[in-house]
């Protein structure tokens, strides 16, 4: 697996801070949330169907030359939450001023929206990379206890991390210490559409999912054991 592509309105500590300082409740577009939930379900079903087609056509051979049949996924029993991944891209630019030329360091945060399916019964996590409007999807990532070396959730940072499993113990340890061989993502209780791109479009999926997020956190803690 690979890393998918700043936190805002997340649960946990930030929710406690809001209640402590008595922040006013937001006005939410309930119809849009309902519509986005329906679109999440539809796009998840389509992604699973496409994944199963690709898996059935793929031939996998282990190190001993034995052919392995990839397991197909049934969409039944999956619960869904909206999430996202961030990548920080740094670049240097030369800037002219009255005092000469100097180097300016610029950091751009790139967001990747995710529909995250999880199944309590099978212990499987399916991550589908989508656009903010939930009109299309691209990459699909499937995780089970068998193909994960380690999973963890940072309470303070609120980042969910899944590390790839290797057949070598040494490689597993190196993967755990590496930033490259892991999948990281976040699941916020609230994503209110306040983050906008330069064209005015929504950056994150508009969603309020307090109870759903709490259920996913409980699932992930069990998944990580």
Specify the residue positions occupied by each region the protein language model found.
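N-terminal functional modules and adjacent low-complexity/disordered segments of proteins
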Residues: 1, 8, 12-16, 73, ...
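Phosphoinositide-binding peripheral membrane targeting modules
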Residues: 83-84, 88-186, 192-225
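Anionic N-terminal interaction surfaces
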Residues: 2-140
């Amino acid at each position: 697996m690979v890393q998918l592509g700043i936190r805002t309105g997340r649960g946990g500590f930030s929710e406690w801070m809001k209640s402590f300082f008595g922040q006013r409740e937001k006005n939410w577009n309930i119809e849009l949330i309902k519509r986005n939930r329906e679109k999440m379900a539809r796009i998840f079903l389509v992604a699973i169907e496409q994944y199963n087609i690709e898996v059935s056509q793929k031939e996998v051979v282990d190190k001993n030359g034995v052919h392995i049949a990839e397991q197909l996924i049934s969409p039944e029993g999956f619960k869904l939450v909206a999430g996202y991944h961030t990548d920080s891209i740094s670049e240097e630019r030369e800037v002219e001023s009255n005092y000469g030329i100097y180097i300016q360091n610029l950091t751009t945060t790139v967001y990747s929206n995710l529909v995250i399916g999880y199944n309590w019964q099978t212990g499987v996590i399916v991550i589908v990379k989508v656009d903010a409007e939930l009109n299309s999807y691209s990459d699909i990532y499937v995780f089970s206890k068998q193909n994960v070396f380690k999973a963890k959730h940072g309470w303070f940072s609120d980042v969910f991390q899944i590390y790839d499993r290797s057949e070598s113990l040494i490689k597993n340890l190196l993967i755990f210490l590496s930033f490259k061989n892991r999948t990281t993502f976040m699941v916020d209780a609230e994503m209110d559409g306040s983050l906008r791109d330069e064209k005015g479009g929504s950056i994150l999926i508009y969603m309020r999912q307090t109870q759903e997020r709490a259920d996913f956190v409980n699932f992930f803690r069990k998944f990580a054991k």
